[in-house]
Curated annotation (Swiss-Prot):
PANTHER family (alphabetical): UBIQUITIN-FOLD MODIFIER 1
Oligomeric and partner information: Interacts with odr-8; leading to deufmylation.
CDD domains: Ubl_UFM1 (cd01766)
GO BP terms in the entry: protein ufmylation; response to endoplasmic reticulum stress; reticulophagy
Record's protein name: Ubiquitin-fold modifier 1
Species this chain originates from: Caenorhabditis elegans
Domain of life: Eukaryota
Function text: Ubiquitin-like modifier which can be covalently attached via an isopeptide bond to substrate proteins as a monomer or a lysine-linked polymer. The so-called ufmylation requires the ufm-1-activating E1 enzyme uba-5, the ufm-1-conjugating E2 enzyme ufc-1, and probably the ufm-1-ligase E3 enzyme ufl-1.
Pfam families referenced in this protein's UniProt entry, alphabetically: Ufm1
Length: 94
C-alpha cells in the first residue's frame, strides 16, 4: 500500500493523488472528497479533468492492482492509500 504523505483526513474528507498513466509526463490531480462519496464519482471527475472518457477508464494502485469503484471513497482510501493511477481503456493491459 502507498504511504500516506499526500493524504490528509480533515473531518470526514479523504485526499487522493491520481496520476494519468497514459501521458508520458505523468500529470496528476489531487482531489479531496468526503469519505462517503461514491468512488465512481471520483473516477468520473478525475477522467473529466484529464479529458479522457470515464466510462472506459480504470483506476489501479501504484502496484498495478485494479480498484473496484463501486464503494465509498473512504473505503478505497483505507484499502489502497492515497496514490492511485487512472488508465484509459486503450491502455488497459499494456
Amino acid at each position: 500500500m502507498s504511504g500516506g504523505t499526500a493524504a490528509t483526513t480533515a473531518g470526514s474528507k479523504v485526499t487522493f493523488k491520481i496520476t494519468l498513466t497514459s501521458d508520458p509526463k505523468l500529470p496528476f490531480k489531487v482531489l479531496s472528497v468526503p469519505e462517503s462519496t461514491p468512488f465512481t464519482a471520483v473516477l468520473k471527475f478525475a477522467a473529466e479533468e484529464f479529458k479522457v472518457p470515464a466510462a472506459t477508464s480504470a483506476i489501479i494502485t501504484n502496484d498495478g492492482v485494479g480498484v473496484n469503484p463501486a464503494q465509498p471513497a473512504g473505503n478505497i482510501f483505507l484499502k489502497h492509500g492515497s496514490e492511485l493511477r487512472l488508465i484509459p481503456r486503450d491502455r488497459v493491459g499494456h
